[in-house]
Amino acid sequence: MTMDDLGARGTTAPTPEEIGAMYDQFGEMLAMTLGSTALHIGMYAPHGQHPPVADLVALADLAQDRQTDFLVDTIDLAPHEHLLDIGCGTGGPAVRLAERTGARVTGINVSKSQLARCQERLTAPNAPQGLAERVNFAYGNAMRLDFADHAFDAAWSIDCIPHLSDRLAGLREALRVLRPGGRFLFTEFALRTSPSAEEVAAFTQMWSCPPLTPFATLVGELQQAGFHVESVRDMTANSALCGELMCVLYEDRRGEIEERFGKEALAHTDPLMAPYRSFCRDHMEYYLLMVRAPEA
């Protein structure tokens, strides 16, 4: 049986023999695209979850919310505490943390468009009452924070540290603005093996970041900055899958991307996707670290 045979059938129901022949010939291809442990539809979201996950974008959104909730649980912020969100993105995690804990959050970002989106979250008609009194956003450079010493009880940085041209400076600034004993929760990539120059270039362009370093280099910089490492979690499986999904969605939404950003964006990005994907899959680690400022 060929694909042409399947297409020619139209709406005619297949015979058991034809179904068997289809799986004999194309079962391995289905396993490559659907999953190989059972060859049935997977439960990508818990039963009854609302809103339901209906496509890959929704699945990616769900994964991001799960990550945010895990970080909120890990930082364990009390209602009276004040957290600095270093590299706050579009504000979703800051708002989610404030809603769940009742704590105050100050977010900083170097992207003006993302800061505009942050403000929209605070003024949206469905924004929780009092949210704008507990959450604020401002333009700010992580390597030169515009805050007084010991201004915050805690800080977190979700996928921002990889962007920094001087990571040690960013770590020292985070320590400076924390009260004695304050905790800093952050994510960071690390280099696992030896990628090709093409793979390194693709990753650094896609992420707008300097080349990654081995994990041991990060540990050394944390010690130089003066932090005490409290816990390290290896989250590499999540980053590898994120890279895979990003590449799939890029191909799936090419038409939308071209319409919104132009053919030039595709021409720039197309040659990066394959080496970016292999870099994420084969050469990168992803860690979640909880560190603390020294006690007074």
Residue ranges of model-derived segments:
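Conserved alpha-helix/loop element of class I SAM-dependent methyltransferases that forms part
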Residues: 43-50, 61-79
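A short glycine-rich, Lys/Arg-flanked "PGG" loop and its adjoining helix->strand segment in the class I
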Residues: 168-183
